[in-house]
From Swiss-Prot:
Annotated GO MF terms: glycerone kinase activity
Any one Pfam family match given in the protein's UniProt record, by short name: FakA-like_M
Biological source species: Staphylococcus aureus (strain NCTC 8325 / PS 47)
InterPro entries given in the database record: DegV_domain_contain, DhaL_dom, DhaL_dom_sf, FakA-like_C, FakA-like_M, YloV-like
NCBIfam families xref list: FakA_VfrB, YloV
GO biological process, one term: glycerol metabolic process
Domain DhaL: from-to ranges: 8-200
Domain of life: Bacteria
Name assigned to this protein: Uncharacterized protein SAOUHSC_01193
Length: 548
């Protein structure tokens, strides 16, 4: 029985919760409704939770209130994607509720889950049931009920998991699209993984990290960061040493804990990755030979690598002396836009964007990424263009915590971002610009062409893995094995008699022949529409389209 949770135990709950989510991130990703190759729910929740875990591991405290503040800060700054932001808000409310406590009992644990739900619902502009919010709400309500008749935090957490799982299984009945695709809510599943890790910690158990099959062609680590090293002489261990050892039958039996302890005596920056056949090692040492000799106790050395880091540092200094690093531009009003692809970034810069954050579909920037740009620009005012629905909440979270007066224009696509930026008036006030830029978003119809990462049926459209998909905003309107057929079906849906301008932004994977045939088709079918073509260079999406 566990009647009290202090900072030490809560830290272990966080660590085990983060590990369990990490182990199941791919499973959570697979539950995403849309088969688009983007920054998925599992990935974003995992990165967010990992940020919270790392902050906790670096600032341990026996006081649960103090540890909660640390955890909340790590989640807040590391939040990526809407699912990550909601996760951070759930625990922001949770941790706020315990900030004055040194330890908590089952009743306060239940009340804190409820406080987290209330905070998260307030943070979402239009809460949707059948999502992570519903699972969190149902679990918290169950916790409040159970806490009335148990003082055991283990028993309480077990009940929370049962009710959270029931709620998760019911999500398709609340959200039609989940039922159509045949999945439960991915965010709710991610939250359940965290709760299951919490229970493991309360029981004194550990969530083991998944052991991935090791790639025999790659070493553990290749690059060195000399940030903070002023003199070459400051480098204590001068040789970056790496080895791969294939375990031998008649050699010493491998015990990871013993292996790590022994290897740590040779130097620092130790990394050890192993599976059933091979162990990979990276360590900074003065004696590479001793490292290799130790490795031979376990089996055959199959790859070795030694780099002189002092010589690397001398080369870094030589290069820095010849290349002055440009400082981040400081401005009165920062116009910060999220971009994907060099061509798109150049378009934004030419239109007046002062700062570009690389991100978009495959890697959503965190709250901290956006905050850093605002702070380093030393601006008094900031306008943020997320250009992706999954970056919107992180942008709003960043705007709410910086000292500068910051606003977010709710752009959900690159074309919307371009249209909004076109409306920026250097002489207008921040609020005036916010109003006219936001208004322009409604005048643009956005489309895109990409490929499917799995078989599914959604919005009445049958989709096969690797087939092309045409989307208008978030709705899939066409999916064919032939790229040109998919594009023309998409454009027929987008273009109308009163359409005036079609903007085409070409991605890095677009084929020239398809582009040429597409332009010819547009000119034949829609001769009155003016066509503007730009090289965007964006990954994942062969084309972005906008119609005005």
């Amino acid at each position: 029985m566990i009647s009290k949770i202090n900072g030490k135990l809560f830290a272990d709950m966080i660590i085990q919760g983060a590990q369990n989510l990490s182990n199941n991130a791919d499973l959570v990703d697979s539950l995403n409704v849309y088969p688009v190759p983007d920054g998925d729910t599992g990935t974003n929740m995992n990165l967010t939770m990992t940020s919270g875990r790392e902050e906790v591991e670096n600032n341990l405290s026996k006081n649960i209130g103090e540890l909660g503040k640390t955890f909340s800060k790590g989640l807040l700054m590391g939040a990526r994607g809407n699912s990550g932001v909601i996760l951070s808000q759930l625990f922001r409310g949770f941790c706020k509720n315990i900030e004055s406590e040194s330890e908590i009992n089952s009743k306060l644990l239940a009340e804190s889950f409820q406080a987290g739900v209330e905070t998260a619902y307030k943070a979402v502009m239009k809460p949707v049931e059948g999502t992570i919010l519903t699972v969190a709400k149902d679990a918290a309500q169950a916790a409040i009920e159970k806490a009335n008749n148990t003082e055991d935090c283990i028993e309480l957490m077990e009940y929370i998991i049962v009710k959270a799982n029931e709620s998760l299984e019911n999500t398709p009945n609340l959200l039609a699209v989940l039922k159509e695709v045949g999945v439960v809510d991915s965010g709710g599943k991610g939250l359940l993984c965290v709760y299951e890790g919490f229970l493991k910690a309360l029981k004194g158990e550990k969530v083991e990290a998944k052991v991935a099959k090791i790639d025999k062609d790659e070493f553990v680590h290749d690059e060195h960061d000399f940030h903070g090293v002023i003199n070459t002489e400051d480098i204590i261990y001068g040789y970056c040493t790496e080895m791969m050892v294939r375990f031998g039958k008649n050699k010493k039996a491998f015990d990871e804990q013993e292996f790590r302890q022994d290897m740590s005596q040779f130097g620092d920056s130790l990394l050890v990755i192993n599976d059933e056949e091979i162990v990979k090692v990276h360590v900074h040492t003065e004696y590479p030979g001793k490292v290799f000799n130790y490795g031979q106790q376990y089996g055959e050395l199959i790859k070795l690598k030694v780099e002189n880091m002092r010589e690397q540092h001398r080369e870094v200094i030589r290069k820095e002396q010849h290349t002055a690093k440009p400082k981040m531009e400081t401005v009165e009003t920062a116009i910060i836009t999220i971009s994907m692809g060099e061509g798109i970034s150049e378009i934004f810069k030419s239109m007046g964007a002062t700062h570009i954050i690389s991100g978009g579909q495959t890697m959503n920037p965190s709250t901290e990424d956006i905050v850093k740009v605002i702070e380093q620009s030393k601006c008094k005012r900031a306008i943020i263009l997320p250009n992706n629905k999954n970056i919107l909440m992180a942008s709003e979270q960043a705007a709410s915590i910086v000292d500068a007066e910051a606003v977010v224009i709710p752009t959900k696509s690159i074309p919307q971002g371009i249209s909004a930026l076109f409306q920026y008036d250097v002489d207008a006030t921040l609020e005036e610009n916010k109003a006219q830029m936001a208004d322009s978003v409604n005048n643009v119809k956005s489309g895109s062409l990409t490929y499917a990462v799995r078989d599914t049926k959604i919005d009445g459209v049958e989709i096969k893995k690797d087939a092309f998909m045409g989307l208008i905003e978030d709705k899939i309107v066409s999916s064919q094995s032939d790229q040109l057929t998919t594009v023309t079906e998409l454009l027929n849906e987008m273009l109308a008699e009163d359409s005036e301008i079609l903007t085409v932004i070409i991605g890095q994977d677009a084929e020239q022949a398809v582009t040429d045939n597409m332009i010819n088709w547009i000119e034949e079918q829609y001769p009155d529409v003016e066509v503007e073509v730009h090289e965007g260079g964006q990954p994942i999406y062969q084309y972005f389209f906008s119609v005005e």
